[in-house]
A protein has these predicted regions:
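Sec-dependent N-terminal signal peptides
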Residues: 1-9
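Function-determining sites in protein domains
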Residues: 9-164
Length: 164
């Protein structure tokens, strides 16, 4: 697990520098280290001043392949009905429990080279805000959610950025 995490961090290049990633409230990714490929999704809310309409969301997918230029795709919740269920499922995602070496038994080591990561805003039960960073390998709720989300959003992506 630690080896896979180290490989994931080492192989994940920075996001495009267009300001979108910085305004996003969530980022999730799947990194396949053995093939030097990754898919990273940044999620941002689209604010409409003085609007009573439900919030809209925008996502950017950055697809990286070995020795190829990055491919950027966009999706918008106003034209992608799959987006809201993906975000609802993110809110319901099961979190792992902290593990203390020497107290807790060690888990299995998986060296398949696929890493999953979610970084998002979070809130504690006492309504205090924080950040959540969750990474794992295959066979976890995070892996299932990322794979399922990428599949659910597959028809939504466009090379043209939506109008905010």
């Amino acid at each position: 697990m630690l080896l896979a995490l180290a490989l994931q961090v080492a192989s994940t290049p920075p996001a495009p520098r267009d300001g979108f990633a910085e305004s996003a409230f969530a980022h999730f990714s799947r990194v396949q280290t053995l093939t030097h490929s990754s898919e990273t999704v940044d999620v941002a809310i689209v604010y409409a001043p003085y609007s009573t309409a439900p919030p809209a969301y925008m996502m950017r997918l950055t697809r990286r392949r070995f020795q190829q230029p990055d491919a950027i795709f966009w999706a918008d919740s106003r034209s992608c009905p799959a987006m809201r269920p993906v975000l609802d499922a993110m809110r319901a995602l099961a979190s792992p429990q902290p593990q203390v070496p020497g107290i807790d038994p060690y888990g299995d080591i998986i060296l398949d080279g696929t890493g999953y990561r979610l970084t998002t805003r979070a809130r504690f039960a006492n309504r205090q805000d924080g950040d959540l960073v969750y990474s794992s390998n295959i066979g976890t709720p995070l892996a299932a959610w990322v794979d399922g989300s990428l599949g659910a959003l597959a028809r939504c992506w466009s090379a043209t950025a939506p109008v905010s």
